[in-house]
């Protein structure tokens, strides 16, 4: 078995059998690569590739004025350095962005009035600032106004052409009406559809339908062109007395029953008898013999056919029959011929008649009938018709109609199929246009209609719109590109108007451009688009999943009300591309999906998944990425197919997928095989061990609930994992990886300094400083805290984990805790999924988490004067001010509770007119307190915690208070420390290199005391200060130059370091950009410690969730034979009906892992007593198995082995990958090696009585998570508070400090009990009887206990509503009084 070695700190025993040939790609690559493509550097002009910001500029520029006397061209663009880095933007509530500078060229022409010839008069070039462009952080997010946001990728229908039918729903007969739709990337939609009478219609932008021939006329075709495009011509030759002779096509009669005998024209022989079915064999025989070329058709066989072209009298030009006219033969009731077009032709002596090849079996007369029904006969009237539909109410002219029609589909500014659309159209219609042809062509429209008619005739298949070849992904870059294009087009209109209105010779490009529309479009997209979402930052997994999300909602997508079942369902093409498990449970089910683990998005926006190539039944290591359309052509085997040593299939028949169907196929026909069993599922689902044993519904809940797990105080990686925990921790950015190899120079809680020894470039000081995030608040108020894992002097390699983040443990994702559980009922406390916990869990902070709340207060400049942040608050006692410093701001470390003042603030009050007495008192005592009111920020009810950080922001030019200056000093000191450390390492490196250069060389001259020509030795250098070493001039010219170069490099790096430091200090000291009217802002961060308590929600990884019902003293919990009390008691009835048996296997495996860990712990104890390593090595061999032990552990030296063994004493971690994990035999083997019974059950004793329970109980170790549904956040109480304005009833919800709704059903309950007075009280004085409420308050104050109920306000609202309807309604008492 392969062995995964994660971070070299802890080994996982790996149970996977299938060899992995492909590394899992970076999990946030989707976001990063897309935005990188959008912002790719624009220094050098690039060809018009239509990609990224370059493509946007090239599609909008050049801009000409209305007279075409000037043109504004785009030259290049450049992104400057961002003003603030990511951390500064988060602290200051700024957007992390870089200024975009665009170089534009304005060319002014001289126009010769006589000839109209243009000559260049003037060319001006200038750099123009075009607003700020948000940048992506290294973790694939954006900082917008100080908060981290994610742009979710959108799934939408790919541009191209689609064929479909209405499934028989439109017409009562259930007839299938076929339709075709051309969807461009941007521009008007074009639909073609059949109606119930089999006529073909076109619609533009879903407006009123027109006959499709109107559209074809508009394209410049005439009646004859349309006939030729859609029908073949067959000539019928008249044979007197016998009928008509025509060409014979044997294929046409296959499977039909001819109504008349089919007769060979040459021999008169009957080929097929009337009424008999023609078999395929008979047809094949006719084709093979090939001696029947023409057949004889009875005279009336031509009646009802349609003429293929105009038949004209040669002499006088009179038209007998027009193309498309029906050939008729009119007979009266006596049988005498009275007329008809056929008679006219025969009378005129026309013996050969070309007719349209329509047999109404394989070819229908749809297009001919549509032509006949169309009132238009030429291009002009057809264009006018289209104009009337598109612009109803406007008087049409031919020029306007023609211009409108051209801009609809043939103007690249208005219509864009995109490369994807063109490729899809070429594939569907077998065309070969270049993918740079982005508008429609006449051939495209004609081919679409042809394919639609073929469908109606029974040839071809409709498209499946849910196939992933017909749905594509728009990632960040593309969404941003579209948005920016909208902004630039708005700007273009303004530029054109300005070019016409100003004196063009004197202006510069800067004067023509107002970049606001473009900047506003960007701001609007990041701030308010449906796809720009507040990042889910509960834990590292939720971050990664959010970035990999695919949404079908959003602008240009579906709406959840209109999305049907098919769109939401799992499709065969989702395999390896989109996860069939992870999706929300509510109304968005199936509309929001997750990218599968190995999937990636190709340049056309289609999702691809990797496969290994199979050649002649042998699996190779060559990996190919396939989109859904490409995969349809292949036969794909599953990753778990049995292979022999050489990689060939063992079985003759292999389980495969062919064009969406699961079949058994011979091994020779297989040409691809999955790269890994987990390529089917998403990241969250692949973190569930034994996923294959869980029901899909529960697996869905498990995937979703892992994202809600709160990071705990002490992270603990799962004993039973799947092997990808390390990948998630790495790619999420939670754990810190070394950028390059080197030695640890310094470590403390806030930073790690590495002296790099690898990947050094000339001029690089080789110092990497990693700043750790300490107790920062995430978007979800969880705590982001990083802890170093390394010691000074440690050697680290590139990408080694050097620090753990939230929910990571030694570089592995750790969302919950390994705890000992027992499946048994316990006095009804685990009824309905309740969970019973031991007091030990609460006492030892096993599931304690830290949450950080942010409170913000701003002092504004009001009309009555500025607000002030101060400690001097009117009518507040010293006790309430105990936590405030002299500036009125709470100090760090203060423990605060509900109602405590965090920041003291006073606001000027409106002056009320003073009485003379007040004026006198004011004059004598200078009483000032009356004109300000206390608006201090207090802690809301229900919150307790410790102040961990305070930030003070001052406006430019506002004097800083003592607290602000203190914070500033601390920040500057921290920056200075960083600078000094970097300088020290730089000096150490440079002087070490200098020493190597000059040691043993001859000095020509040097500082005082060094004789010319003396050799440079250690002793000599020891007598000089380091600064004097540079003064030693070497004899060798080349070496002297190298020393000089080193000196210059050293000085340059010192200057750069100082400049960087000064820039940062200047930013700290500079005032802050605050919103208008705000003079000063204070943010207070409070850390809240949340222990596990009844009402908190917990869950496992298998969708098994529950709420804690009771905390039981440790001594009362059931305990094992060795006296160990269990931590959790779960209900066994929660397993069978839910069918998530994976949790039981996990429990057994975890029990075995714990048993192994205890054995290793015993062996370490033995080693400490005797100093003998043998027991430790044996215990490790037993735990990991011989093969893995030999491969990874046997070669370790004693210290390394002891460290590894010490890390697994609580339990030996194992990895059981999804669909390729431990089987039942492996579980039994693990239990046996750990010394347990293979049933996984143990004897348990009742903690209260000490008696053994009657039967054995399943006990094991399970990984449980604490979810972000904490009872502290939900519990809430109110006495008096805010009321709704209209109804005067208390508001609802904790956020509004609302009350508990006493609803309709609750009223029924009280009525049923006959509790009349209680009911009256509930509906009046405790709710919306305003006068009654006041009276109750008064009687409470007076100490009385009587009150009177009045009329509820909601009744008054009802009366007013009824009066609003014009009905007078009054409330009268028994005496008839109002």
From Swiss-Prot:
Species in which this protein is naturally found: Dinoroseobacter shibae (strain DSM 16493 / NCIMB 14021 / DFL 12)
Catalysed reactions, semicolon-separated: RNA(n) + a ribonucleoside 5'-triphosphate = RNA(n+1) + diphosphate
Name of the gene: rpoB
CDD domains listed in its UniProt record: RNA_pol_B_RPB2 (cd00653)
Subunit annotation: The RNAP catalytic core consists of 2 alpha, 1 beta, 1 beta' and 1 omega subunit. When a sigma factor is associated with the core the holoenzyme is formed, which can initiate transcription.
Cysteines paired by S-S bonds: none
Listed name of the protein: DNA-directed RNA polymerase subunit beta
E.C. code: 2.7.7.6
Keyword Nuclease included in the entry's annotation: no
GO molecular function: DNA binding; DNA-directed RNA polymerase activity; ribonucleoside binding
């Amino acid at each position: 078995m392969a062995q995964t070695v994660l971070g070299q700190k802890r080994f996982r025993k790996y149970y996977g059998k299938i060899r992995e040939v492909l590394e899992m790609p970076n999990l946030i690559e989707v976001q990063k690569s897309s935005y990188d493509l959008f912002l790719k550097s624009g220094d050098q002009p690039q060809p018009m590739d239509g990609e990224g910001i370059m493509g946007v500029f090239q599609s909008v520029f050049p801009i000409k004025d209305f007279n075409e006397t000037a043109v504004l061209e785009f030259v290049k663009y450049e992104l400057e350095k961002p003003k603030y880095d990511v951390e500064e933007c988060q602290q200051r509530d700024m957007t992390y962005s870089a200024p975009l500078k665009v170089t534009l060229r304005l060319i002014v022409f001289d126009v010769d009035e006589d000839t109209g010839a243009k000559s260049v008069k003037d060319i001006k070039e200038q750099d123009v600032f075009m607003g700020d462009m948000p940048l992506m952080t290294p973790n694939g997010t954006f900082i917008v106004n100080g908060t981290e946001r994610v742009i979710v990728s959108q799934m939408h229908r790919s541009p191209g052409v689609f064929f479909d039918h209405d499934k028989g729903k439109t017409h009562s007969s259930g007839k299938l009406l076929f339709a075709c739709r051309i969807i461009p990337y941007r521009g008007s939609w074009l639909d073609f559809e059949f109606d119930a009478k089999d006529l073909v219609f076109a619609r533009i932008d879903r407006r009123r339908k027109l006959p499709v021939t109107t559209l074809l006329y508009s394209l410049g075709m005439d009646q004859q062109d349309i006939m030729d495009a859609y029908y073949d011509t067959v000539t019928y030759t008249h044979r007197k007395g016998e009928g008509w002779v025509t060409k014979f096509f044997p294929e046409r009669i296959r499977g039909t029953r001819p109504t008349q005998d089919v007769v060979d024209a040459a021999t008169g022989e009957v080929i097929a008898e009337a009424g008999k079915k023609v078999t395929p064999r008979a047809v094949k025989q006719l084709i093979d013999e090939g001696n029947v070329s023409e057949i004889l058709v009875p005279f009336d066989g031509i009646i009802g056919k349609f003429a293929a072209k105009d038949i004209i009298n040669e002499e006088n030009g009179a038209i007998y029959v027009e193309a498309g006219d029906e050939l008729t033969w009119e007979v009266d009731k006596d049988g005498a011929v009275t007329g008809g077009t056929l008679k006219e032709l025969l009378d005129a002596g026309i013996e050969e008649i070309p007719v349209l090849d329509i047999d109404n079996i394989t070819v229908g007369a749809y297009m001919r009938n549509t032509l006949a029904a169309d009132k238009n006969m030429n291009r002009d009237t057809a264009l006018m018709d289209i104009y009337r539909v598109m612009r109803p109410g406007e008087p049409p002219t031919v020029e306007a109609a023609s211009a409108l029609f051209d801009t609809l589909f043939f103007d690249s500014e208005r219509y864009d199929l995109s490369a994807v659309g063109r490729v899809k159209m070429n594939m569907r219609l077998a065309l070969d246009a270049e993918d740079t042809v982005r508008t429609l062509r006449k051939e495209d429209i004609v081919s679409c209609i042809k394919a639609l008619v073929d469908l109606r005739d029974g040839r071809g298949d409709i498209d499946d719109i849910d196939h992933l070849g017909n749905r594509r992904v728009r990632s960040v870059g593309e969404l941003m590109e579209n948005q920016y294009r909208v902004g630039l087009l708005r700007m273009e209109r303004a530029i054109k108007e300005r070019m016409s209105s100003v004196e063009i010779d004197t202006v510069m490009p800067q004067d023509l451009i107002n970049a606001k529309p473009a900047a506003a479009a960007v701001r609007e997209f990041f701030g308010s688009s449906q796809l720009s979402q507040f990042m889910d930052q509960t834990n590292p997994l939720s971050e990664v999943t959010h970035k990999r999300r695919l949404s079908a909602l959003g602008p240009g997508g579906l709406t959840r009300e209109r999305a049907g079942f098919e769109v939401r369902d799992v499709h065969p093409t989702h395999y390896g591309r989109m996860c069939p498990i992870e999706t929300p449970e509510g109304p968005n089910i199936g509309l929001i999906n997750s990218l599968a683990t190995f999937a990636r998005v190709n340049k056309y926006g289609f999702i691809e998944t990797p496969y290994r190539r199979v050649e002649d039944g042998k699996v190779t290591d060559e990996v190919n990425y396939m989109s859904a359309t490409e995969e349809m052509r292949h036969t794909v085997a599953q990753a778990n197919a049995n292979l022999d040593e050489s990689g060939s299939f063992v079985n003759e028949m292999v389980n495969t997928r062919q064009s969406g169907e699961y079949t058994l196929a011979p091994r020779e026909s297989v040409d691809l095989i999955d790269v890994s069993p987990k390529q089917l599922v998403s990241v969250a689902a692949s973190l569930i061990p034994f996923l294959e044993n869980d029901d899909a519904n529960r697996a869905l809940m498990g995937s979703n609930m892992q994202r809600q797990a709160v990071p705990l105080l002490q992270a603990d990686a799962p004993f039973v994992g799947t092997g990808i925990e390390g990948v998630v921790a790495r790619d999420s950015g939670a754990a810190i990886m070394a950028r390059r190899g080197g030695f640890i120079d310094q470590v403390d809680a806030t930073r790690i300094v590495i002296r790099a020894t690898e990947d050094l470039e000339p001029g690089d000081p080789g110092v990497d400083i990693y700043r750790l995030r300490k107790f920062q608040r995430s978007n979800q108020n969880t705590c982001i805290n990083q802890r170093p894992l390394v010691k000074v002097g440690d050697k680290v390699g590139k990408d080694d984990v050097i620090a753990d983040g939230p929910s990571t443990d030694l570089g592995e994702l750790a969302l919950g805790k390994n705890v000992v559980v027992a499946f048994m009922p316990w006095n009804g406390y685990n009824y309905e999924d309740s969970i019973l916990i031991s007091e030990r869990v609460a006492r030892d902070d096993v599931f304690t988490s830290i949450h950080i709340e942010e409170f913000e207060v701003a002092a504004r400049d009001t009309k009555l004067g500025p607000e002030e942040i101060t400690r001097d608050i009117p009518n507040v006692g010293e006790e309430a001010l105990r936590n405030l410093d002299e500036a009125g701001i709470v100090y760090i470390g203060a423990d605060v509770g509900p109602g405590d003042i965090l920041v003291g603030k006073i606001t000027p009050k409106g002056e009320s007119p003073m009485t003379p007495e007040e004026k006198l008192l004011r004059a004598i005592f200078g009483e000032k307190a009356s004109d300000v009111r206390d608006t201090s920020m207090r802690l809301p009810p229900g919150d307790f915690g410790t102040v961990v950080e305070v930030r003070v922001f001052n406006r430019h030019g506002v004097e800083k208070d003592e607290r602000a200056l203190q914070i500033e000093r601390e920040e500057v000191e921290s920056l200075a420390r960083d600078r000094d450390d970097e300088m020290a390492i730089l000096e150490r490196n440079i002087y070490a290199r200098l020493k190597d250069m000059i040691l043993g060389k001859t000095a020509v001259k040097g500082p005082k005391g060094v004789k010319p020509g003396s050799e440079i030795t250690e002793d000599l250098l020891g007598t000089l200060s380091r600064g004097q070493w540079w003064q030693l001039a070497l004899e060798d010219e080349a070496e002297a130059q190298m020393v000089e170069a080193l000196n210059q490099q050293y000085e340059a790096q010192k200057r750069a370091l100082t400049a960087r430091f000064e820039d940062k200090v200047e930013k700290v000291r500079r005032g802050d950009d605050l919103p208008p009217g705000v003079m000063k802002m204070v943010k207070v961060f409070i850390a809240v410690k949340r222990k596990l308590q009844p009402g908190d929600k917990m869950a496992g990884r298998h969708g098994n969730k529950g709420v804690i019902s009771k905390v039981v003293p440790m001594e009362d919990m059931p305990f094992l034979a060795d006296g160990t009390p269990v931590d959790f008691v779960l209900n066994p009835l929660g397993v069978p009906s839910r069918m998530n048996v994976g949790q039981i296997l996990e429990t057994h495996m975890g029990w075995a892992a714990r048993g192994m860990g205890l054995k290793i712990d015993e062996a370490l104890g033995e080693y400490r007593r005797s100093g003998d390593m043998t027991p430790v090595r044996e215990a490790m061999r037993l735990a990991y198995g011989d093969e893995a032990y030999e491969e990874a552990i046997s070669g370790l030296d004693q210290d390394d082995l002891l460290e590894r063994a010490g890390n697994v004493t609580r339990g030996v971690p194992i990895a059981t990958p999804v669909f390729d994990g431990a089987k039942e035999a492996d579980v039994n083997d693990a239990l046996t090696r750990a010394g347990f019974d293979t049933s996984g059950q143990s004897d348990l004793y009742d903690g209260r009585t000490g008696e053994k329970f009657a039967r054995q109980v399943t006990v094991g170790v399970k990984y449980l998570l604490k979810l972000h549904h904490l009872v502290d956040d939900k519990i809430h109480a109110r006495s008096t508070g805010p009321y709704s304005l209209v109804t005067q009833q208390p508001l609802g919800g904790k956020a509004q400090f609302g009350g508990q709704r006493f609803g309709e059903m609750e009223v029924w309950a009280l009525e049923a009990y006959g509790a009349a007075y209680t009911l009256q009280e509930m509906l009046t004085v405790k709710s919306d009887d305003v006068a009654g409420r006041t009276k109750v308050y008064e009687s409470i104050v007076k100490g009385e206990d009587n009150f009177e109920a009045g009329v509820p306000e909601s009744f008054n609202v009802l009366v007013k509503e009824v009066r609003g309807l014009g009905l007078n309604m009054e409330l009268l008492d028994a005496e008839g009084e109002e």
